[in-house]
């Protein structure tokens, strides 16, 4: 019986590289200078904490973290409990309602239960300055998250990648479609959701692909938070 691979096994060496250390020091300097950086330091790598490498069956790629107060906590599209679901996530709920008539839109936007079921909720850039979208886009995070995608591609099989919008779809070049599945649609943002995200059927298609492989489908329903 082989020991399951951990994130440390597959990306530990990547995190030792000079460019990665440079990202961490750059972000730390920004925080020390009094800038507000999201998510908080302890949450930056939550996507990896909540979804162990051996559990990754689905990847939903985001771009960079939400840049409003108390929103970002290290999972793409997700917000902390008590914070209203942002517009992109509301559109994801609308799509779930279309695909699953029994889906009840939750009173929150906290997606931890998806992550714990094997949905890696990965942003391609892992930090952002308050109120400034894409402010850390050139820090080098994408070198790291590209390496993450490459490792999933190499060492896992049958993973379903949900690539919404042009930014996420660029990452498709790392994915071998002979061993994995890619589902593409426009981004769920209000700017583009009506161009084909709404009606894409991706949540149900994901579960059909999991079931075909004998894997447990995702329960997309989120329990209410009191």
UniProtKB/Swiss-Prot annotation:
Keyword field contains Electron transport = no
UniProt record, GO biological process: base-excision repair, AP site formation via deaminated base removal
Q: Name where it mostly resides.
A: cytoplasm
Family annotation (CDD domains)? UDG-F1-like
Q: InterPro entries from the xrefs?
A: UDG_fam1, Uracil-DNA_glycosylase-like, Uracil-DNA_glycosylase-like_sf
Q: Which UniProt keywords apply?
A: Cytoplasm, DNA damage, DNA repair, Hydrolase
Active-site residue list: 64 (proton acceptor)
* Single Gene Ontology MF annotation: uracil DNA N-glycosylase activity
Gene3D superfamilies from the xrefs? Uracil-DNA glycosylase-like domain
**Superkingdom, according to UniProt?**
Bacteria
User: According to its UniProt record, which reaction does this protein catalyse?
Assistant: Hydrolyzes single-stranded DNA or mismatched double-stranded DNA and polynucleotides, releasing free uracil
Enzyme Commission no: 3.2.2.27
Could you tell me where this protein is found in the cell? Cytoplasm
Q: Name one GO cellular component term.
A: cytoplasm
* SUPFAM superfamilies (alphabetical): Uracil-DNA glycosylase-like
What's this protein's function?
Excises uracil residues from the DNA which can arise as a result of misincorporation of dUMP residues by DNA polymerase or due to deamination of cytosine.
> Which NCBIfam families does this UniProt record tie to the protein?
PRK05254.1-1, PRK05254.1-2, PRK05254.1-4, PRK05254.1-5, ung
Q: Which family does it belong to?
A: Belongs to the uracil-DNA glycosylase (UDG) superfamily. UNG family.
Output this protein's name. Uracil-DNA glycosylase
Please report the organism this UniProt entry assigns to the protein: Proteus mirabilis (strain HI4320)
Q: What is the lineage of its organism?
A: Bacteria, Pseudomonadati, Pseudomonadota, Gammaproteobacteria, Enterobacterales
Query: What gene is this protein a product of?
Result: ung
């Amino acid at each position: 019986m082989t020991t399951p691979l951990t994130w440390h096994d597959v990306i530990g060496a990547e995190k030792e590289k000079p460019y990665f250390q440079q990202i961490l020091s750059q972000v730390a300097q920004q925080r020390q200078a009094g800038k507000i950086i999201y998510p908080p330091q302890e949450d930056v790598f939550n996507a990896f904490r909540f979804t162990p490498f051996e559990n990754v069956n689905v990847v939903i790629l985001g771009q960079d973290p939400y840049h409003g107060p108390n929103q970002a906590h290290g999972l793409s599209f997700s917000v902390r409990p008590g914070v209203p679901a942002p517009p992109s996530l509301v559109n994801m709920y609308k799509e779930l309602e279309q695909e699953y008539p029994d889906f009840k839109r939750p009173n929150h936007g906290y997606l931890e239960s998806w992550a714990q079921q094997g949905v890696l909720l990965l942003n391609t850039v892992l930090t952002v300055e308050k109120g400034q979208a894409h402010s850390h886009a050139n820090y080098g995070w994408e070198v790291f998250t590209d390496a993450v995608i490459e490792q999933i591609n190499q060492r896992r099989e049958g993973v379903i990648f949900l690539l919404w919008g042009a930014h996420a779809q660029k990452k498709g070049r790392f994915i071998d479609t002979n061993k994995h599945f890619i589902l593409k649609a426009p981004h769920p943002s209000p700017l583009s959701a009506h161009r084909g995200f709404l009606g894409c059927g991706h949540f149900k298609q994901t579960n059909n692909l999991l079931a075909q492989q004998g894997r447990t489908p995702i329960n997309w329903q989120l329990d209410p938070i009191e």
